[in-house]
Regions:
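Glycine-rich phosphate/adenosyl-contacting loop at the front of the ribokinase-like
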Residues: 1-55
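Conserved N-terminal subdomain of the carbohydrate kinase-like
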Residues: 23, 49-108
Length: 108
């Protein structure tokens, strides 16, 4: 069992646009995916995918969507333990246009 520490976890949200990004206008989304992120979470995912049991230790409130996102991965051998904190994990958003151009918007 390996325990990873993720002091700054995130929810990584990727949205795809059906056309080019129109700055200053309303843009409709083609699709949206949300995955847990942060270096420790990512390492724990890779370990679990490789057959090694891993626990990601993250600062998160008990109702933080990050915890549900990690659990929803359904990876055997991947566990998550939360250290209670106030507030929610940051959300990083990537906007991908049809030509492959990606714009990232990361919370501090």
């Amino acid at each position: 069992m390996i325990v990873t520490l993720t002091p700054n976890p995130s929810l990584d949200r990727t949205v795809t646009l059906p056309g080019p990004l129109l700055r200053g206008a309303v843009n409709r989304l083609g699709s949206v995916t949300v995955e847990p992120g942060g270096k420790g979470v990512n390492v724990a995912r890779v370990l679990a995918s490789s057959g090694q049991e891993a626990t990601a230790l993250v600062p998160a409130a008990s109702d933080d969507p990050l915890l549900r996102a990690i659990d929803s991965l359904g990876l055997p051998g991947l566990a998550c333990r939360a250290v209670p904190v106030a507030g929610a994990a940051r959300i990083n958003t990537a906007v991908t246009e049809p030509d492959g151009t990606t714009t990232k918007l990361n919370e501090s």
